[in-house]
């Protein structure tokens, strides 16, 4: 009896399959997700050597970089505004004219503040982690490859930037920045404590191709190549220097990468 019931179930299943409308291979809808590449995140950290709360903000960024990786969460410390200082009278200052341009353009009210992927406005420290998490959840179709060739005799670095989009054409700008790690310079702490040998990392040094970069249009049909030759400013240590490159437009930063200037 059990065997007979089994055969009846098999026959019923065959009948159901025979009643299904066959779909040809050329009629099936196959959803193909859009191609994407690994998304990195840029945090522009507005800071100053006379800002007593800025060292703690820098520590927060370092902890977030340990979580995500320093090549994925790319930090740039922009010394600007009234609490930043320029070099004078034997005191090493990290403030730059380009940094002041950004400080004014983004209407930074005070420091420490940050802009993350140039979306969401100027943010206080306690919101950084959440905003960074949200940005990593986004996707991008932009691929950037940076190559640096440094000549110690001339202090010139040749920068080759290869860019491509995996989808429709993208209009934007390529920005190249010089950033330096392990910069020893004074820093003020709470209770007006001054550390004259404080080590500053990811310090913004210069906008290599101008404050707002180079206008370009990326196509999925070809790789866009930019060649740039730049002379390192006096005082910048080649072994501590990085080139940060990113593509941005009105929607924010689409992709960011970094590359060491010299591996020696």
Label the predicted regions.
Residues 28-30, 61-66, 102, 130-135:
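Intrinsically disordered, low-complexity boundary segments flanking structured domains
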Residues 2-5, 14-42, 46, 52:
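Bacterial Sec-dependent N-terminal signal peptides
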Residues 71, 77-264:
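Short, conserved sequence motifs used for protein processing/export or organelle targeting and
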Residues 20-24, 57-58, 190-191:
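Short N-terminal helix-initiation segments at or just after the protein's N-terminus
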Residues 33-81:
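Local sequence-structure signature of Cys/Sec-based thiol-disulfide redox active-site neighborhoods
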């Amino acid at each position: 009896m059990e065997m007979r019931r089994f055969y009846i179930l098999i026959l019923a299943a065959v009948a159901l399959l025979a009643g299904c409308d066959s779909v040809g291979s050329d009629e099936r809808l196959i959803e193909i997700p859009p191609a994407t590449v690994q998304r990195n995140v840029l945090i522009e950290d507005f800071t100053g050597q006379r800002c007593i709360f800025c060292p703690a903000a820098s520590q927060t960024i370092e902890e977030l970089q340990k979580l995500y990786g320093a090549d994925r969460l790319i930090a740039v410390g922009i010394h600007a505004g009234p609490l930043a200082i320029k070099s004078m009278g034997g005191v090493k200052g990290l403030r730059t004219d380009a940094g002041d341009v950004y400080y004014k353009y983004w209407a930074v009210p005070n420091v420490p503040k940050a802009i993350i992927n140039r979306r969401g406005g100027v943010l206080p420290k306690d919101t950084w982690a959440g905003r960074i998490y949200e940005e990593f959840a986004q996707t991008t179709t932009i691929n950037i490859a940076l190559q640096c060739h440094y000549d110690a005799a001339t202090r010139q670095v040749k920068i080759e930037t290869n860019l491509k989009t995996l989808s429709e054409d993208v209009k934007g700008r390529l920005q190249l920045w010089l950033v330096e790690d392990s910069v020893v310079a004074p820093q003020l702490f709470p209770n007006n404590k001054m550390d004259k040998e404080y080590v500053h990392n990811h310090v913004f040094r210069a906008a290599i191709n101008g404050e707002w970069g180079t206008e370009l249009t990326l196509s999925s049909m070809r790789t866009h190549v930019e060649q740039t030759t730049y002379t390192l400013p006096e005082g910048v240590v080649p072994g501590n220097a990085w080139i940060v490159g990113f593509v941005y437009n009105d929607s924010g930063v689409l992709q960011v990468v970094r590359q060491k200037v010299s591996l020696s």
